[in-house]
């Protein structure tokens, strides 16, 4: 079974039914005889540019790819905190990964990288002043919700 076949099946699944978690996706694939680890599914979700919404995983339309971070942040971002050169984003449970991927896709030059958990994103800036600027930028998004 190839990567492209597995990813094609993932797209068919999310187009046909509500898939809300990676566990649900893994179970659906398993029922089709396709075994995939959580790491593999995370990569597939990133490669396919899927976003996790309240209605489950969805494909991101080409025209949505630019402003997607603003949209996701507006819907799921709850708090922005800073500790030296690190900015911590709190999101609704289960949405940190999709918000982090969208932020990564923005390619902000002041962001070195991100690490996401279930409801927390660690945004790494090169230094404290840059982290302060990132925090202000993100707080601006919170204020416009």
Swiss-Prot record:
GO terms for cellular component: cytoplasm. Keywords: Amino-acid biosynthesis, Arginine biosynthesis, Cytoplasm, DNA-binding, Repressor, Transcription, Transcription regulation. One of its GO terms (biological process) is L-arginine biosynthetic process. SUPFAM superfamilies: C-terminal domain of arginine repressor, Winged helix' DNA-binding domain. It comes from the Bacteria. Gene3D superfamilies: 3.30.1360.40, Winged helix-like DNA-binding domain superfamily/Winged helix DNA-binding domain. It is found in: Cytoplasm. The keyword Transferase does not apply. Pathway: Amino-acid biosynthesis; L-arginine biosynthesis [regulation]. Pfam families: Arg_repressor, Arg_repressor_C. One of its GO terms (molecular function) is DNA binding. InterPro entries: Arg_repress, Arg_repress_C, Arg_repress_C_sf, Arg_repress_DNA-bd, WH-like_DNA-bd_sf, WH_DNA-bd_sf. Belongs to the ArgR family. HAMAP family: Arg_repressor (MF_00173). Regulates arginine biosynthesis genes. This is Arginine repressor. The gene is argR.
